[in-house]
Amino acid sequence: MENVIKYMFNGYEATVIRPENPNGKWIWKTEFLYAFDDAERELLSRGYTRVYYSISNKYGSYHAVRLMHDFYRHVIKEFELDDKCILFGFSRGGLYAFNFALFYPECVSKIYLDAPVLDMRTWPPEGSENREQVYKEYDLTPETIKTFKGHPVENFAEFFSHGIPLYLIAGDSDEIVPFEYNAGKMLDYCFDNGIRIKNYIKSRCKHHPHSLYDVKSIIEFVEE
């Protein structure tokens, strides 16, 4: 029987879902803990601990990454977890997963990105509350965001230099997080630079649904 543990850490809610027989390995989903989680539920049944730290509306900012690292150090000790996590970054959660791995690659064993936001110039949309939150969190303006070098798409070289195994899943008709400028741009970079990553591009698929109807390839990626 799984055990769901909720508590506050540094002012933000943490959720740790412990399997009946934990194996020390853990999935850290950076946003939307229970959304499209067939793969996570299967992995839980195989002994993986599921972890979520609710620091929403920080969009993977430098502040968010520092909070994540503090939480990481706490959670591996408190729950006797492996010192490398497996990051799952869905949509805006891709910002957190990418940036945490960028700054703390030694803390990450694998990354699964699903329809990730990799360029904040393309999402959130201008005029939205989310966009205003991005400006505040990153200390940006409508002008400075255009030349900001902290977008994940500006940091592919350093990110891929760490050699962290990556699985990228996205829909090629994403109407919310434009494929061409986000997941598509990552694929183009990998192709142009001879970098091999596991990927599954869903033809004529929009932003939703995330994940896959058959999550076998996700399970295999995590366990291989």
List PLM regions with ranges:
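Alpha/beta-hydrolase active-site loop
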Residues: 59-80
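Alpha/beta-hydrolase fold nucleophile elbow
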Residues: 79-91
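Glycine-rich nucleophile elbow surrounding the catalytic serine of serine-hydrolase chemistry
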Residues: 89-99
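Hydrolase active-site cap/lid region
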Residues: 99-144
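The feature captures the conserved acid-bearing segment of alpha/beta-hydrolase catalytic domains
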Residues: 132-191
